[in-house]
C-alpha cells in the first residue's frame, strides 16, 4: 500500500465523584504528564493501569518527557507498547550522538570522533555548538515512532486530542503546541536549555516547557477538563545543602518558575499521582528505565481506589477508540525539496541521500538516506518532514 507525499529536508490526591456532573453527559477526563527527563518513564505504569481499567482520557497534555510519553499514548500506543519501547530503546545512542561511522563519507572517516570539541563554520566564522548533545538520533527516534500519524497536523485529530508545552525563549512566554507534526512538538518540548538546541518556530525559538510550566494542569483546566488525572515526576526545589555544584544551581534557576507554580498545579488535580518521593534516580538515568517504571507503580498503587472508582463511574459512557490509526508502510515522493542548504552542498547531499521522486520507500530507507546526508559532516543536523500533496 503506497501513498504520495512531499518530502522536505531542513538543515539546521483527591477524587471528585462523577455524581457532581450531569448524568446524561460524559465528563471530560484529562491526563496531564509532567516533565522530568528520564524520570518521565515513571508515567508509563499509570498508562498501563488506565488501559486495564478501560479509562480512555479525552485529552492528554504533556511537557518534556511527559510530551514524549503522552504524545505516544495520544496517537494510539498502549501503555504496554510504550513500556516495551522504553525497555528496548538504546538510550545512550538516542541521547548521545548524531552520526554513525558507517554513514560518514570516506574522506571524513579518518577524522571521525577524534576530537573532544567540534567547531562549525557559519558565515565565514568558526562557532562552537549551542548544546551539549547532538540531537540527530533523538530526532530520528521520535520521527520513527510518530510515523503512523505523520499526516495528522491538527492534534485534535489524534485518537486522543493532545497538547504539548514549550517555552518561547525569545519573548519569555508559554507556548501550547496544538498543531503541526507530533514529532516536532515532542522535540520542541524536550529542548532542555544548554543540553539540546532550541527549536526554530515561526519567528522565535522554543525550549523545554519546564522553564515556565513543567506540570501544565492549568492548560487542561482551561480546555474544559472536568476530571484531571495528573502524574508528577518533576520534583521539588533543592535545599541549600543539595545545591553543591554549578549544574544543580543552574538547573534550579532554570526551573524556578515551574517549581513555584507546582503547588497550584497539583491542587488542580482530581487524582494526583505523586512519583517524587518514590524515584531514586536522576533526570539523566535513561538506562535505568526498568527501575523507573517499577518505581512508577508505587504512586499508581497509592491511587488505585480513586482510579477504580473513576472506571466504575465511566462505564455507563462510551469510551473513544484508542489505537494507532491505519497507515501505509511505504511512501512515494512526488517532490523532494531541500531547504536551508547552499547550492554548493545541494548536489553532494542529493547524491549521498539517494532519495528520488516516484520511488517507493520504507521508513527505514528514508532514515538511511537522512543518515547518509548527515554523514557528509557538513551539517550539525538534518531534519525531515513528510507533507501531503
State where each predicted segment sits.
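Patatin-like phospholipase
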Residues: 21-63, 71-388
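Bacterial Sec-dependent N-terminal signal peptides
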Residues: 1-27
Amino acid at each position: 500500500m503506497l501513498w504520495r507525499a512531499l518530502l522536505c529536508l531542513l538543515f539546521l490526591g483527591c477524587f471528585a465523584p462523577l455524581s457532581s456532573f450531569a448524568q446524561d453527559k460524559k465528563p471530560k477526563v484529562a491526563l496531564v504528564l509532567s516533565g522530568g527527563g528520564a524520570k518521565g518513564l515513571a508515567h508509563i505504569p499509570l498508562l498501563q493501569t488506565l488501559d486495564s481499567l478501560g479509562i480512555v482520557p479525552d485529552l492528554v497534555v504533556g511537557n518534556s518527557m511527559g510530551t514524549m510519553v503522552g504524545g505516544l499514548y495520544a496517537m494510539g500506543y498502549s501503555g504496554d507498547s510504550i513500556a516495551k519501547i522504553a525497555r528496548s530503546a538504546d538510550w545512550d545512542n538516542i541521547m548521545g550522538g548524531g552520526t554513525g561511522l558507517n554513514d560518514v563519507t570516506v574522506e571524513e572517516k579518518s577524522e571521525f570522533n577524534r576530537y573532544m570539541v567540534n567547531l562549525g563554520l557559519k558565515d565565514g566564522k568558526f562557532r562552537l555548538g549551542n548544546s551539549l548533545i547532538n540531537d540527530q538520533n533523538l530526532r530520528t527516534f521520535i520521527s520513527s515512532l510518530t510515523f503512523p500519524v505523520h499526516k495528522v497536523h491538527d492534534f485534535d485529530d489524534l485518537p486522543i486530542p493532545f497538547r504539548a508545552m514549550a517555552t518561547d525563549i525569545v519573548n519569555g512566554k508559554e507556548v501550547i503546541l496544538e498543531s503541526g507534526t507530533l514529532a516536532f512538538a515532542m522535540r520542541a518540548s524536550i529542548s532542555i536549555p544548554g543540553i539540546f538546541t532550541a527549536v526554530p518556530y515561526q519567528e522565535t525559538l522554543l525550549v523545554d516547557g519546564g522553564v515556565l510550566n513543567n506540570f501544565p494542569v492549568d492548560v487542561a483546566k482551561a480546555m474544559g477538563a472536568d476530571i484531571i488525572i495528573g502524574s508528577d515526576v518533576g520534583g521539588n526545589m533543592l535545599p541549600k545543602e543539595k545545591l553543591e555544584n554549578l549544574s544543580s544551581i543552574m538547573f534550579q534557576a532554570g526551573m524556578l518558575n515551574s517549581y513555584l507554580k507546582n503547588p497550584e498545579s497539583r491542587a488542580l488535580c482530581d487524582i494526583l499521582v505523586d512519583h517524587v518521593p518514590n524515584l531514586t534516580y536522576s533526570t539523566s538515568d535513561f538506562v535505568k528505565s526498568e527501575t523507573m517504571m517499577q518505581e512508577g507503580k508505587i504512586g499508581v498503587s497509592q491511587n488505585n481506589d480513586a482510579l477504580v472508582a473513576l472506571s466504575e463511574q465511566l462505564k455507563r459512557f462510551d469510551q473513544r477508540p484508542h489505537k494507532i490509526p491505519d497507515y501505509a508502510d511505504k511512501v512515494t515522493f512526488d517532490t523532494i525539496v531541500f531547504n536551508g542548504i547552499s547550492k554548493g552542498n545541494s548536489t553532494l547531499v542529493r547524491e549521498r541521500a539517494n532519495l528520488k521522486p516516484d520511488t517507493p520507500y520504507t521508513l527505514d530507507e528514508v532514515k538511511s538516506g537522512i543518515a547518509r546526508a548527515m554523514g557528509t559532516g557538513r551539517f550539525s543536523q538534518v531534519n525531515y518532514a513528510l507533507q501531503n500533496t
